[in-house]
């Protein structure tokens, strides 16, 4: 049980996909201008990353390894992610049309989010079992969502703050992301994996 708790805390805080591994920076910078879109993107990404991790582990364990098709792993995972994203898009369109309009082009772009493919590939490379793969995917998504929501809240405050002209816009956003990364480095001694 403690192994799963350490995996969760380690993935969310210590080895955060955005601030430590630098995966998923495109949606991190692109969707984080408003808190509500960041929350929606975080929820959609959480669903996709968790489901994609589970499906990728199942396909790798039951199809690719037994048939000795490991060289097709990346292609198979990209196809799995595309199917999961299409399923998520249909669910979001039916359940929340407002969120669907707010996310706009970013929802289909989850397919190309390197964090989703990264979590699927890292699951296999780290040798996780089924439960660890599901938890790792969920934890990575929770960490991604946490950072995205925190960053969106900070960016909303920065939008009305008196920022010097050369630092307005993306410049202050990158500085803020760097400071967040430094803050998350404080968790580095928390969990030893």
From Swiss-Prot:
Residues 1-4, 60-62, 123-133, 192-193 are periplasmic. The chain crosses the membrane at residues 5-25, 39-59, 63-83, 102-122, 134-154, 171-191. It is found in: Cell inner membrane. GO terms for biological process: electron transport chain. Its EC number is 7.-.-.-. Keywords: Cell inner membrane, Cell membrane, Electron transport, Membrane, Translocase, Transmembrane, Transmembrane helix, Transport. It is an enzyme of class 7 (translocase). Residues 26-38, 84-101, 155-170 are cytoplasmic. The keyword Transferase does not apply. InterPro entries: Ion_transpt_RnfA/RsxA (IPR011293), NqrDE/RnfAE (IPR003667), NqrDE/RnfAE_oxidrdctase (IPR050133). Its main location: membrane. GO terms for cellular component: oxidoreductase complex; plasma membrane; plasma membrane protein complex. It is a multi-pass membrane protein. The complex is composed of six subunits: RsxA, RsxB, RsxC, RsxD, RsxE and RsxG. Belongs to the NqrDE/RnfAE family. Part of a membrane-bound complex that couples electron transfer with translocation of ions across the membrane. Required to maintain the reduced state of SoxR. Probably transfers electron from NAD(P)H to SoxR. PANTHER family: INTEGRAL MEMBRANE PROTEIN OF SOXR-REDUCING COMPLEX, ION-TRANSLOCATING OXIDOREDUCTASE COMPLEX SUBUNIT A. NCBIfam families: PRK05151.1, rnfA. This is Ion-translocating oxidoreductase complex subunit A. It comes from Escherichia coli (strain K12). The lineage of its organism: Bacteria, Pseudomonadati, Pseudomonadota, Gammaproteobacteria, Enterobacterales.
């Amino acid at each position: 049980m403690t192994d799963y708790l350490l995996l969760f805390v380690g993935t969310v805080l210590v080895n955060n996909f955005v601030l430590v591994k630098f995966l998923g920076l495109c949606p991190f910078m692109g969707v984080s201008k408003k808190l509500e879109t960041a929350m929606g993107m975080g929820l959609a990404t959480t669903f996709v990353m968790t489901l994609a991790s589970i499906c990728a582990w199942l396909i790798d364990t039951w199809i690719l390894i037994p048939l000795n098709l490991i060289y097709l792993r990346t292609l198979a995972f990209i196809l799995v992610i595309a199917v999961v994203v299409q399923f998520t898009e249909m669910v979001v369109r039916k359940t929340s049309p407002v969120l669907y309009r707010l996310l706009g082009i970013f929802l289909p772009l989850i397919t190309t989010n390197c964090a989703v493919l990264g979590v699927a590939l890292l699951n296999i490379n780290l040798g996780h079992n089924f439960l660890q793969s599901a938890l790792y995917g969920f934890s990575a998504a929770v960490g991604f969502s946490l950072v995205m929501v925190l960053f969106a809240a900070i960016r909303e405050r920065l939008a009305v703050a008196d920022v010097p002209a050369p630092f307005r816009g993306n410049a202050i956003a990158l500085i803020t992301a760097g400071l967040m990364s430094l803050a998350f480095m404080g968790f580095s001694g928390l969990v030893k994996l």
